[in-house]
C-alpha cells in the first residue's frame, strides 16, 4: 500500500504563520530557531509518511496543532536559564524538540517506549543540530537516575501522554528537589485531578491560548511532596 503523502505547502506560508503565531504568544525567535522549527515540520511530514508519527498530515495543521501548541507553554515554563527537562511519551518529539530549539540552555530528554519513535527523535537531534537534546527509550516508571538518565529533572512534561493521575504516579520519582510535573491537556480534566495520588497537588492551572486553534487547552503544574 502506498503511504499517503502530506500536501505540499510553500515554506514562506508556514514561516508567515509561525511569525504571526509567535508574536501572538509574545515569543521572540532567532532566524536559526525559526528555521529549525520549519525544518522540523518538514521532517515530521517526511517521516510521518513511513512511520505514522501523527494523524495530522497537513503541514499547516502540523504547525498549528504541534508547533504553536507546544510553543504556547514556553512563557509559563520560562524563568530558568538552565534546566533539566524530561518529555514523557514524546512520540514525534512534542513538546520536547520545540523546547530544545527555543531554550538552548535547557537540557531536554525525550522518552518513549516505541523504538521507531526514538529513532526519529535521534534523527531530529542530528538533523536539527540540537546538542542539548537526548533520547532514552523505555517505560518512564523504569527509568532510574544515575542509570538510564543522568539525574533527576527540574521539569517533567507531557502532551496528552496519559491520565494525569497515572502520569504523576509513573514519573514522580524523577522529579528533582524544587522541580515539578507539567501536563498539557485539552478540556479541564476534573476527574483526573480528583484522582491525583497522595502527596501531589495541582499548584497552577493555566488556560492556554494557542494561536489559530479554536480548541480548549490547559497546562497544569503538579507538585509532589517526595521530590528529594
Curated annotation (Swiss-Prot):
Molecular-function annotations in GO: rRNA (guanine-N7-)-methyltransferase activity
UniProt cross-references to InterPro entries, sorted A to Z: rRNA_ssu_MeTfrase_G (IPR003682), SAM-dependent_MTases_sf (IPR029063)
Segments crossing the lipid bilayer: none
Sequence positions that bind S-adenosyl-L-methionine: 89, 94, 140-141, 159
Catalytic activity: guanosine(527) in 16S rRNA + S-adenosyl-L-methionine = N(7)-methylguanosine(527) in 16S rRNA + S-adenosyl-L-homocysteine
Enzyme nomenclature, EC number: 2.1.1.170
Listed GO CC annotations: cytosol
CDD domains the record matches: AdoMet_MTases
Pfam families in alphabetical order: GidB
Protein keywords: Cytoplasm, Methyltransferase, rRNA processing, S-adenosyl-L-methionine, Transferase
Source superkingdom: Bacteria
Cellular localisation: Cytoplasm
Primary location group: cytoplasm
Function: Specifically methylates the N7 position of guanine in position 527 of 16S rRNA.
HAMAP family: 16SrRNA_methyltr_G
Similarity-based family: Belongs to the methyltransferase superfamily. RNA methyltransferase RsmG family.
Identification of the protein by name: Ribosomal RNA small subunit methyltransferase G
Organism: Burkholderia cenocepacia (strain HI2424)
